[in-house]
Structure formats: structure tokens, C-alpha cells
Design a protein with these regions (language model features):
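Short amphipathic alpha-helical segments and helix-helix/interface helices
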Residues: 78-82
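Conserved acidic
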Residues: 68
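Von Willebrand factor
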Residues: 5-61, 71-76, 91-94
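Anion (oxyanion) recognition and catalysis
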Residues: 85
């Protein structure tokens, strides 16, 4: 989740079933505040898609971001997006 500061709620290797992952996602609560999308993307790049946390190098690295669509700092967000794209990450924004 993210607003002012991003927070990883769980890692890819924390759960072993689709049901457990769906339940973990359902338990995430909406958090009000700013939309520092750049900070969330930087966290994904540094920590989220890491083999130590369950990411596998032989599969596409996909991230889905659910946001209100208005980044607090569009310039920094574009910079983070370029870094992720340079590492061949696939991003979907909702």
C-alpha cells in the first residue's frame, strides 16, 4: 500500500495458495493521504520483485498498481517508471 510512505503488506513467498493470497489482498485496508506513486514504484524496484521474497527470474516480472491516478510528483513517478521499464518490468495501473 502507499500514500505518503509505501508499505509491503506481504511478499510473493508468504502464501502458497491462491485462496490465501486472495484473503491477504482482501484484508488490505484503504489508506488515505497523498499519492506518492514514485515512492511505491521505487519500493517495488528495490524490494518487491526480489528472489529473496519469492520472485523468480524465469517468469515475467509483473506489477499491478491500484491508484487514484493522480501522482503527487509526476516527474519523479516518470523517472521511476523509466527505471522499472529499463529492467523489463511489466506494469499495469488501475
Amino acid at each position: 500500500t502507499f500514500s505518503d510512505q509505501p508499505k509491503i503488506k506481504f511478499h510473493l513467498n508468504d502464501y502458497t495458495s491462491k485462496t490465501a493470497i486472495a484473503n491477504a489482498i482482501s484484508d488490505i485496508k484503504w489508506k488515505g493521504g497523498n499519492t506518492f506513486l514514485d515512492r511505491a514504484l521505487a519500493m517495488v524496484r528495490r524490494q518487491g520483485l526480489n528472489p529473496r521474497y519469492g520472485s523468480r527470474p524465469d517468469v515475467p516480472q509483473i506489477t499491478v498498481i491500484i491508484t487514484d491516478g493522480v501522482s503527487t510528483d509526476p516527474r519523479k513517478t516518470r523517472r521511476e517508471l523509466k527505471k522499472l521499464h529499463a529492467q523489463n518490468y511489466i506494469l499495469y495501473a488501475i
